[in-house]
């Protein structure tokens, strides 16, 4: 449950291990679900606040709780000042309302991953594209792939799939390579943070690839205001359920979608200038 919506942010549990505890603002819901017993560990796909902001509060509650995160994200758990400064630029005075308080995690609790490890029955692979500190986990026994934001957002019961593209790390080519890595696992299902399980793995990943390119091209051709209006119109044409629409827009705030794609193109000036209509 995040700000009154049940299908926006999910925390997965396997054998007592939690994958992406979510924001501190949703922590009461998580604690109600797991009870008083300390989890075996926290596995983070990445350190974006909707996935990981509750981490510090959980370690504060259970001081021996171990946390696994990519090596690029680990320093920002220990000292979240830069992460907070970046988030404040993005969310302004809505930061604490959306994500709650972000507490530091003692360095002794943090285990840095690079990809290629096996941790608590989970294979780990480095999957940048959405974030430079993103990893995915494959639970070898069940074949479930815990994919964070790499496999995009899909709010049930709609089939609309939308990759979240906030700044600063969006890289379409790296993202496509990460999708190929996940697909090569041949997982039995994908476990999305936003939201739920996906059984038709190949079809879903194909749509993510297509949608990534579509959104990148749209952002290349339009300015921020026009892109947001265009994206909102396309989403509303596909979703006629007001509750589902509200949950999607909470999981993927449209105001931040353009920024990551625009930054992606700004690093590729030659390609951006070749866009149709570019002068």
PLM features: what roles do these ranges have?
Residues 19-22, 40-47, 68-70, 127-129, ...:
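Active-site neighborhood of phospho(di)ester-bond hydrolases with catalytic His/Asp-centered motifs
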Residues 1-37, 137-149:
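Conserved beta-strand hairpin/beta-sheet module of binuclear metal-dependent hydrolase folds
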Residues 201-210:
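Histidine/acidic-residue-rich catalytic or RNA/ligand-binding cores of hydrolases
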Residues 72-76, 197:
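Short histidine/acidic/glycine/proline-rich micro-motifs that form metal-
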Residues 28-72:
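Active-site metal-binding motif and surrounding structural segment of the metallo-beta-lactamase
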Residues 77-126, 132-202:
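Metallo-beta-lactamase
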